[in-house]
């Protein structure tokens, strides 16, 4: 896909003005980093705040009297029990019990659900949703009508509160519970604000009309200027999520992986019926052949696709790897046989034809302190 055919978010001009390096990603031209670099951006989110343009993500609305049960059967987690004004992480699975995508479902109204899907999977997910929901509910793809801005970090709530007015009287954005979602005005624009994110820090995601994104973006940057806010590209977004041990579709999870081996059994509400439930239950009963583990790599930076070695034999593969700026170590996620998945197991990763030492460790690599 050439640059001329790449999609651009409504904030493209803002990124260019800020000096961002723009790269192709999932059919979009997105900022990978800004002039100060990925490590500086990463540390800003851990220590203060960062603002992200996530408008490339997909948004699908499911509405109507049949929406609750339709989405509950579609998603692995308990959606039937999800209260209005709450969100829940879950999986879209196929009948084989492997992962079509990981999503967050927001219950905005009694009969209105918003499913946020990964940018690379919008068309595939939309077809999957339509196939399984059928005529039970109304489905709307709002991906190109919805802008998404995230503010993440320990100072996110202070920054958000200065430019946000909730539609609920006598409430502030700081009152919003984790995985809560509420109607609001952000920088003067109507929005839904959720206390969700992909960094391992406290933070918010703001869903806005596509043509109203620039005002809130500039207001949030201005409001957070004295508090250390920085614009954050996809590069730091990846290092942040990896330290927090969040899965990336196409790396840790895809249609060749099941939730049990991927460490996502907790998202599967096996007491209910959902697409792929029976196949997943069978894997859980017999046990998976492999599991995803966290690694600390001593002699280099492991990358996606690098081989994991034990006793001179290739036993697995790295799904993601980086230097973790917060933890100060080279970290990775990898699939290995169950017998080698125990914390403390000594392995190696083959980097440039050289086997470097690696050790299985507990994840997440970084967990923010409770406040």
List each language-model region with its residue ranges.
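Acidic active-site catalytic centers that drive phospho-/nucleotidyl reactions
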Residues: 53, 102, 205
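Well-ordered mid-protein domain cores that form the structural environment of catalytic cofactors
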Residues: 78-132
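Conserved, structured C-terminal
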Residues: 1-26, 30-34, 108-371
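Internal amphipathic helical hairpin motif
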Residues: 65-99, 157-189
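Acidic, proline/glycine-enriched N-terminal capping motif
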Residues: 1-90, 98
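Membrane-targeting and insertion segments and their boundary/processing signals
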Residues: 41-45, 96-99, 103, 187-194
